[in-house]
A protein has these predicted regions:
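Solvent-exposed loop/turn segments at secondary-structure junctions
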Residues: 48-51, 86-90, 134-139, 199-204, ...
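N-terminal active-site segment of His-dependent metallophosphoesterases
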Residues: 20-106
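Active-site neighborhood of phospho(di)ester-bond hydrolases with catalytic His/Asp-centered motifs
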Residues: 44-46, 78-85, 124-133, 198, ...
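Hydrophobic h-region of N-terminal signal peptides that target proteins for export
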Residues: 10-18
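Conserved beta-sheet core of the metallophosphoesterase superfamily
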Residues: 247-335
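A short C-terminal boundary segment appended to hydrolase-like catalytic domains
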Residues: 36, 320-375
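Active-site-proximal segments of metal-dependent phosphoesterases and phosphodiesterases across multiple
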Residues: 98-100, 104, 108, 205-208, ...
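Extended active-site neighborhood of metal-dependent phosphoesterases/phosphodiesterases
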Residues: 92-208, 219, 262, 283-311, ...
Length: 375
């Protein structure tokens, strides 16, 4: 905790550089700003499982959420979006459990508590929207649908949910939880937005709940963003099938076919889940294309639906490394009401003079614009 306190103390001495065009010698610490003062943002946090599975890595996840909280006003952050796999194992009782004793040193309860502690940085400041990953259910990875998530993420813990959480779906036991939930936002330029976060591999009942919701009189004119754990592979293809024992379920292509493609107002899909360790050249420069994917397809009525995958859990080059170098994405919703500017940033690298020059990922796969259709 001393190290985390030191990190957070460093963050208070911020100076600003543009999120859209960092140039010249970086200031220390590096703080992004919106390219337009009328914009707002949402922060996309990729799978945190490799932060929380090791005791030594857990402060890095809390660094991410503390940074988001500290920049809430600077970046006009409306929500933090978590792509799932909040933990590595949902129900592991023994830290050194077989079959993989090297895959973390924390029990599941310790992992979920670390998640809760990190999210507490955002309580009362903004809603955090969490979709459920395959590691968040079952024993280790989606053997069945039991999840500890409802014990740690529930409406009463964060007062910011009161103004945004508008609907929940029954889980596999018929109990309403935040495993599948919808959140509403309003903006003068963007109008009405609805963000729907799904359980992992959503069941038919969950897809039908979402369909009825987005077609209802209350939300049929909202632009809908789907936050789901598994959707795109690293090559940008939609995943057609996965090897988990879970049943009943819908894999990503079925989710597209049954819900997204026929819809008139789903305008964006965000996901994590996939991604492989980047390759490093002789100078230590990483090729991060394996941690990101983007594609655009037309819905049945002809409007474009961008789909974006971002997962940096192995962004340091190792599945069992530091958890991902604290990479996150800043989604800047521009005041034209249709453009989202995406940039990729590490609060960890930003706070040290030795690494500040690495705080941004500026390749085409990590800095781009998305155009979002109106219903």
């Amino acid at each position: 905790m001393k190290r985390l306190a030191t990190i957070l103390l460093l963050l208070t001495a911020a100076m600003t550089v543009s999120a859209q065009a960092p140039v010249g010698e970086p200031q220390i610490p590096v703080y992004p700003s919106l390219s337009d003062g009328e914009s707002f943002s949402m922060i996309m946090v990729p799978d945190p499982q490799s932060y929380v599975k090791f005791a030594a890595n857990q402060p890095l996840f809390e660094l991410q959420t503390a940074w988001i909280a500290q920049n809430a006003e600077r970046l006009n952050i409306r929500a933090a979006l978590f792509t799932g796999d909040m933990v590595e194992q949902n129900n592991k009782l023994i830290a050194a459990a077989i079959p993989n004793p090297n895959n973390g040193d924390r029990t599941s309860r310790q992992q979920w508590q670390a998640v809760s502690d990190a999210l507490a940085r955002l309580d009362g400041k903004m809603p955090y929207i969490v979709c459920q990953g395959n590691h968040d259910i079952g024993y280790i990875a989606a053997e069945h649908r039991y999840s500890q998530m409802p014990d740690y993420i529930y409406p009463e813990r964060n007062s910011a949910f009161a103004a945004t959480l508008v609907a929940t779906a029954p889980n596999h036991e018929g109990i309403h939880t935040m495993e599948s939930a919808a959140y509403e936002f309003h903006d003068k330029a963007w109008g009405d937005l609805l963000v729907i976060a799904f359980e992992f591999a959503p069941r038919d009942e969950t897809l039908e709940w979402a369909r009825q919701l987005i077609e209802s009189e209350a939300y049929r004119n909202h632009r809908v963003i789907i936050l789901t754990h598994s959707f795109l592979a690293t090559d940008g293809s939609r995943i057609e099938k996965e090897g988990y024992k879970l049943s009943p379920r819908n894999w990503p292509q079925a989710v597209w076919d049954k819900l997204i493609y026929p819809s008139k107002n789903i305008c964006l899909v965000l996901c994590g889940h996939t991604g492989t360790p980047p390759k490093f050249d002789a100078t230590g420069t990483a090729d991060y294309r394996s941690t990101s994917a983007l594609r655009v397809d037309k819905a049945a009525d002809g409007h474009d639906i961008p789909q974006m995958m971002f997962n940096s859990q192995n962004g340091d080059g190792d599945w069992n490394g530091n958890g991902g170098d604290c990479w996150l994405r800043i989604l800047e919703f521009k005041p034209d009401g249709k453009t989202i500017s995406v940039s990729t940033f590490s609060p960890l690298f930003a706070i040290s003079k030795r690494t500040a020059h690495m705080a941004w990922r500026n390749e085409a796969c990590d800095r781009f614009d998305i155009t979002v259709a109106r219903p």
